């Protein structure tokens, strides 16, 4: 790729705005689920599908994008992504019944499933290795800001307008992205004749779909129920068969040779732990603040805002530090901040001052910001160029699956501990919620400590 005549600014703007909207939509609806279950007259388990369905679609489609990026041009993939995003968003905004809204969510997620891997692939193609950290830092900002701002902005919208506006508000941004992309995005990938192996797609769908589905409904059906246990087992078996098939094929759907690179595997593990912890925290923390500290949804969003904002300010700086000093200088201090954050969260009860929550969240988000983009950059830098599409598909899929598992398991533990407290200790809901979140944050703390240890083995790929 000739780096001279490529206008990186407009290209990044088009890709990142579309990515931001997709990730914003991923979490923005969570705050409206209670209201929507009443409007559509469906129960809490059913309404949860608006979130689960989104995750499930990502888990199923992202593995396939690795091969699609080799079959279709960058521009074709970009246009397809925006087509899905815009159609899905408009359909969601006008949805008269639950089934239409759910369908719209799946179409929206399809758009995001394409744009995330595509953005990473374009960054790794249009930026030379010494500038990738900075560019990935900006992408990391978007990956964190989208889900983090979702609940805050949605809370404001729900207070003033109706839930439809959670969708309408994003349309101008998607149109901006479409126009910029149309004029500026070049074809950066070399396409080749790839035949898509149907059996691989089926195994991957059953595999990732089964695991994400099984884990997502675990809390409702009980972890030992046949539905949950069965779908997870079937999913795992399908994934094993999928992996075996990939290693035997000449042109695999997902090239697993990426796993031969130790730094890639190390980064992948750290990335999964970070996502498992982060996405479950973004769900459990608002539950703790609303149930134990009794603050409104809107106030919860405001408490979490400074951490998210500072993260946006620091993301590009962290990226430049990574480019200059290498991975360990940024990642290890970041993992230590995350450990401090979870250690503090685990000690909070029903009397915690709100300013303490703000400060802790800032520490936490800074730590995550230092870890996330840097780990992703280093993980992919460990691979030769021809493995980028596969490496990206593997990282993106594993983080979606880890996030889905994190949310499902941590919310289940939160509820179980909370209910146990109510029956065994006292009928005191705030204290029960605090005991539930405390358990979750202590478990997350253990994962966070594992990440500190793993970060010590991080180094710059040769």
Could you say what each language-model-derived stretch is?
Residues 90-91, 156, 209, 213, ...:
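Alpha-helical transmembrane segments of multipass membrane proteins
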Residues 2-3, 130, 178-205, 247-262, ...:
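Flexible interhelical linker loops that connect adjacent transmembrane helices
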Residues 10-24, 29-33, 40-53, 66, ...:
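12-transmembrane solute porter fold
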Residues 62, 66-199:
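Helix-loop-helix hairpins in multi-pass membrane proteins, especially solute transporters
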Residues 181-185, 214, 420-424:
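Transmembrane alpha-helical segments of integral membrane proteins
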Residues 56-60, 90, 144, 148, ...:
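Hydrophobic/small/kink-forming positions within alpha-helical transmembrane segments
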Residues 189-190, 205-228, 243-248:
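Phenylalanine-glycine-rich, low-complexity intrinsically disordered regions
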Residues 422-435:
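Short, membrane-exposed interhelical loops at transmembrane-helix boundaries
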């Amino acid at each position: 790729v000739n780096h001279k005549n490529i206008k990186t600014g407009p290209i990044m703007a088009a890709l990142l705005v579309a990515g931001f909207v997709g990730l914003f939509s991923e979490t923005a609806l969570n705050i409206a689920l209670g209201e929507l279950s009443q409007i559509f007259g469906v129960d809490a388990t059913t309404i949860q599908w608006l979130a689960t369905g989104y995750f499930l679609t990502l888990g199923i489609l992202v593995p396939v994008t690795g091969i699609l990026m080799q079959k279709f041009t960058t521009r074709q993939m970009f246009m397809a992504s925006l087509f899905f995003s815009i159609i899905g968003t408009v359909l969601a905004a006008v949805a008269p019944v639950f089934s239409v809204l759910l369908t719209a969510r799946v179409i929206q997620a399809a758009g995001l499933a394409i744009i995330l891997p595509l953005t990473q692939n374009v960054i790794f193609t249009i930026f030379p290795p010494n500038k990738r950290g900075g560019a990935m830092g900006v992408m990391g900002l978007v990956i964190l800001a989208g889900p983090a701002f979702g609940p805050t902005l949605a809370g404001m919208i729900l207070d003033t307008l109706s839930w439809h506006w959670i969708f309408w508000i994003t349309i101008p941004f998607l149109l901006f992205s479409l126009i910029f992309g149309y004029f500026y995005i070049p074809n950066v990938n070399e396409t080749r004749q790839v035949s898509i192996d149907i059996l691989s797609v089926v195994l991957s769908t059953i595999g990732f779909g089964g695991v994400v589905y099984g884990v997502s409904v675990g809390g409702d059906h009980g972890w030992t129920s046949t539905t949950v246990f069965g779908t997870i087992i079937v999913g795992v078996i399908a994934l094993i068969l999928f992996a075996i098939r990939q290693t035997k094929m000449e042109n695999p759907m997902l090239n697993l040779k990426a796993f031969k690179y130790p730094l890639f595997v190390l980064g992948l593990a750290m990335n999964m732990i970070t996502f498992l912890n982060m996405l479950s925290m973004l769900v459990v923390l608002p539950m703790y603040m609303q149930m134990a500290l009794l603050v409104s949804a809107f106030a919860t969003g405001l408490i979490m805002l400074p951490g998210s904002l500072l993260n946006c300010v620091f993301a590009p700086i962290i990226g430049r530090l990574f480019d200059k000093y290498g991975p360990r200088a940024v990642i290890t201090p970041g993992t230590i901040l995350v450990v401090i954050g979870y250690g503090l969260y685990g000690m909070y009860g029903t009397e915690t001052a709100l300013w303490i929550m703000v400060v802790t969240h800032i520490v936490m988000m800074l730590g995550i910001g230092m870890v996330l983009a840097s780990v992703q950059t280093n993980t992919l830098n460990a691979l030769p160029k021809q493995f980028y599409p596969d490496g990206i598909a593997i990282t993106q899929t594993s983080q979606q699956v880890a996030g889905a598992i994190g949310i499902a398991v941590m919310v289940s533990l939160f509820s179980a501990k909370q209910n146990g407290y109510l029956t065994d200790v006292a009928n005191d809901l705030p204290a029960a919620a605090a005991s539930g979140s405390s358990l979750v944050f202590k478990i997350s703390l253990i994962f966070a400590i594992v990440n500190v240890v793993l970060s010590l083995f991080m180094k710059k790929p040769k």
